[in-house]
Amino acid sequence: MVKVTFNSALAQKEAKKDEPKSSEEALIVPPDAVAVDCKDPGDVVPVGQRRAWCWCMCFGLAFMLAGVILGGAYLYKYFALQPDDVYYCGLKYIKDDVILNEPSADAPAARYQTIEENIKIFEEDAVEFISVPVPEFADSDPANIVHDFNKKLTAYLDLNLDKCYVIPLNTSIVMPPKNLLELLINIKAGTYLPQSYLIHEHMVITDRIENVDNLGFFIYRLCHDKETYKLQRRETIRGIQKREASNCFTIRHFENKFAVETLICS
């Protein structure tokens, strides 16, 4: 029998020869790992801070977008809003309010005067805009008038004085937009001859209105940057009314089948 043996010293020597290889393999480090270790810690942004900046940017963009939308809607309404119908009409009336149901042959002929005005009707908004140009007679002022049925207010802008006057809407004198539109269509078609009479209303200036923002879009559009005052209505009568005050001005207009002379006094 042959007994095979190994030299233990030789085995240990070969094991020692293998050790440098393993040590060399342990020293191999990827280059990118070295690059990471070389970064400045101050250049690394914390995750929480990046999230905060992201939320700030999102909120800022949302506010900017909301501002653009609201601003665009306001500018569209302010500059691009057009009335449903625009009419330029005239109304003949008897100034002295003499109405003859059956005029006699020897009766004097009735002397008619004429009011001409530009009427814009915003039917969906329940608003009437009336522009009275410089009248034929010097005893009446040109004016712009807004009747807002939603706000139940009337505003007069006297173009000579460049001042605004606001009073509660008088629905007994002012036709609703739908009815006024029908009247204007009939006048335009010639089915209604606008020969009518004149009524008088007397108003007194009271307090000044400092802020017109709450008076509705249309009255704000008419009266912003203008001196604006409240009016108090006195009794409206048919026929000539004696003028009790000398510091007055008159606006003649119509938004019904009859003409109205609005006397405004301080």
Curated annotation (Swiss-Prot):
Residues marked Cleavage (site): R243, E244
Quaternary structure and interacting proteins, as annotated: Homodimer; disulfide-linked. Interacts with SPPL2A and SPPL2B. Interacts with APP. Mature BRI2 (mBRI2) interacts with the APP amyloid-beta A4 protein; the interaction occurs at the cell surface and in the endocytic compartments and enable alpha- and beta-secretase-induced APP cleavage inhibition. Mature BRI2 (mBRI2) interacts with the APP C99; the interaction occurs in the endocytic compartments and enable gamma-secretase-induced C99 cleavage inhibition. May form heterodimers with Bri23 peptide and APP amyloid-beta protein 40.
Glycosylation sites: N170
GO molecular function, one term: ATP binding
Designated gene of the protein: Itm2b
PANTHER family: INTEGRAL MEMBRANE PROTEIN 2B, INTEGRAL TRANSMEMBRANE PROTEIN 2
Organism: Mus musculus
Protein's name according to its UniProt entry: Integral membrane protein 2B
Keyword terms, alphabetized: Cell membrane, Disulfide bond, Endosome, Glycoprotein, Golgi apparatus, Membrane, Secreted, Signal-anchor, Transmembrane, Transmembrane helix
Any one cellular-component term (Gene Ontology): endosome membrane
Higher taxonomy: Eukaryota, Metazoa, Chordata, Craniata, Vertebrata
Post-translational modification: The ectodomain C-terminal part of the imBRI2 is processed by furin producing a secreted Bri23 peptide and a mature BRI2, membrane form (mBRI2). The remaining part of the ectodomain of mBRI2 containing the BRICHOS domain is cleaved by ADAM10 and is secreted (BRI2C, soluble form). The membrane-bound N-terminal fragment (BRI2C, membrane form) is further proteolytically processed by SPPL2A and SPPL2B through regulated intramembrane proteolysis producing a secreted C-peptide and a BRI2 intracellular domain (BRI2 ICD) released in the cytosol.
Function: Plays a regulatory role in the processing of the amyloid-beta A4 precursor protein (APP) and acts as an inhibitor of the amyloid-beta peptide aggregation and fibrils deposition. Plays a role in the induction of neurite outgrowth. Functions as a protease inhibitor by blocking access of secretases to APP cleavage sites.
